Design a protein with these regions (language model features):
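P-loop (Walker A) phosphate-binding loop of NTP-binding proteins
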Residues: 39
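NTP-dependent small-molecule kinase module
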Residues: 165-171, 179-240
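Hydrophobic anchor at the beta1->P-loop junction of P-loop NTPases
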Residues: 36
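Conserved lysine of the Walker
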Residues: 44
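Glycine-rich phosphate-binding loop used to anchor ATP phosphates in small-molecule kinases
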Residues: 79, 83-145
Length: 240
């Protein structure tokens, strides 16, 4: 009798432990590699970090330091190509290290898409510089893995500039010219209107709290989990 009680208690402890494991396991994603994209100020990095924490994924965050940016903003001759190539080589090095390390065995959320480099190149470079850039880009892009899903975060230019002004005040960061952000936002819209390399979720972020609301995060995860092939548009409804 005592043996039967001990066995029953042992079984109870095992099932209770398993229940605890399943209870606290973070929800998984079907997509192993997700890239978030959008213009400056849209909230890519903050969302990547929150999503990764929520689903126990690793993050790949873009390295934004560039010694040529000051000269580029000052419109010094040759600085645009120098800044663009520096970003391109940095992004390729980061993507190549990921591929070699096989980090995609765990879900990975990246706050940029490698192809976005061309958005800036076509906006910033003249024809001669663009010819040089394009030859190098085509060579490097062969080594870069495509994401399983791209999430394009949209926002009106006025909202982007408002967020960038707040960021500048908080961190003493450089804020690009509002007219440049307008052109960049339009370039992003054009790029993703024609994008077809991977499944694409387009998210209108004007009414989204990407930094604080768990409900917002849960709603977005539902959209991500429901993605199939092609492009889907998600325009959240305002609450209340």
């Amino acid at each position: 009798m005592n043996q039967a009680i001990r066995e029953a208690y042992r079984t109870f402890v095992i099932f209770r432990s398993l229940a605890a494991v399943f209870r606290y396991t973070r929800p998984a994603l079907d997509f192993r590699y997700i890239a978030l994209e959008g213009p400056p100020g849209v909230g890519k990095t903050a969302l990547a970090e929150r999503l990764a924490a929520h689903v126990d994924a690793t993050t790949v965050l873009e390295e934004t330091d560039n010694p040529f940016l000051g000269d580029f903003y000052a419109e010094r001759p040759g600085a645009a190509l120098q800044a663009q190539l520096f970003f391109l080589l940095n992004r390729h090095r980061q993507q190549e290290s990921l591929r070699q390390a096989d980090l995609f065995s765990q879900a990975t959320i990246c706050d940029y898409l490698f192809e976005k480099d061309r958005i800036y190149a076509y906006l910033n470079l003249d024809d001669n510089d663009l010819f040089i850039y394009q030859r190098l880009y085509e060579l490097l892009a062969r080594d870069v893995a495509l994401p399983d899903l791209v999430v394009y975060l949209q926002a009106p230019t006025e909202l982007l500039n408002k967020r960038l002004r707040a960021r500048e005040a908080e961190a003493d960061a450089y804020r690009p010219n509002p007219a440049y952000i307008q052109k960049l936002n339009e370039a992003y819209q054009h790029f993703f209107f024609h994008y077809a390399a991977t499944p694409l979720l387009v998210v209108e972020t004007s009414q989204l709290d990407l930094t604080g609301s768990d409900d917002t995060l849960d709603d977005l995860l539902k959209q991500i989990r429901g993605m199939g092939r092609g492009t889907r548009y998600y325009v959240p409804r305002t609450r209340g």
